[in-house]
UniProtKB/Swiss-Prot annotation:
It is found in: Cytoplasm, Cytoskeleton; Cytoplasm, Perinuclear region; Cell membrane; Golgi apparatus. The modification Phosphoserine is found at residue 179. A lipid is attached at residue 4 (S-palmitoyl cysteine). EF-1 binds magnesium constitutively under physiological conditions, EF-3 and EF-4 bind calcium cooperatively and EF-2 binds neither calcium nor magnesium. It comes from Bos taurus. One of its GO terms (molecular function) is nuclear localization sequence binding. Modulates calcium-dependent activity of inositol 1,4,5-triphosphate receptors (ITPRs). Inhibits agonist-induced intracellular calcium signaling. Enhances inactivation and does not support calcium-dependent facilitation of voltage-dependent P/Q-type calcium channels. Causes calcium-dependent facilitation and inhibits inactivation of L-type calcium channels by binding to the same sites as calmodulin in the C-terminal domain of CACNA1C, but has an opposite effect on channel function. Suppresses the calcium-dependent inactivation of CACNA1D. Inhibits TRPC5 channels. This is Calcium-binding protein 1. GO terms for cellular component: cytoplasm; cytoskeleton; Golgi apparatus; perinuclear region of cytoplasm; plasma membrane; postsynaptic density. It is a lipid-anchor.
Amino acid sequence: MGNCVKSPLRNLSRKMRQEETSYTVVQTSEEGLAASGELPGPLLMLAQNCAVMHNLLGPACIFLRKGFAENRQPDRSLRPEEIEELREAFREFDKDKDGYINCRDLGNCMRTMGYMPTEMELIELSQQINMNLGGHVDFDDFVELMGPKLLAETADMIGVKELRDAFREFDTNGDGEISTSELREAMRKLLGHQVGHRDIEEIIRDVDLNGDGRVDFEEFVRMMSR
């Protein structure tokens, strides 16, 4: 079984509790407002419900609240909202809209849903898909594959809807990418103070897989899954 987002989040949550005397943590009141000011909905949700977004640069770290605390039991059927989450992830990677996902895209699709599959797991899945499904996965196959994982491992995980909502709040101009200025503004809102341009550029360089100087949704998912 691949590594799940919930494990690093729990580790970082413990680290946050150990270090909160030396860092400024985003605090939320009973009404759900951050002490540093009222945040937009998805950003506030993320601040309340995540442990730590990123831990690259010390003062540029963003500490976020742990959560997504709905305990899900494996001995039940998928709920409608969980099926919709699977459908949304499937649509994201059904690039030519033919109703199939290529097995090469399955790893990124799983990461979008909050799973960090190992290389061995991806190899095994690819072999299974190539042997039994002709190298492509339709939605029913996808539900059969991902449903048990969703039932067994989604407690404390970041779902695709939460990631997409948060990405939209970072991507203020709606062009599908997060720029240096957009990331700096989001961090200012979460931290309550401005982060230096050089620090922001370092963060973007670290997560910018294609080297275009901006963060797209796939790169954002990887950043949030660290």
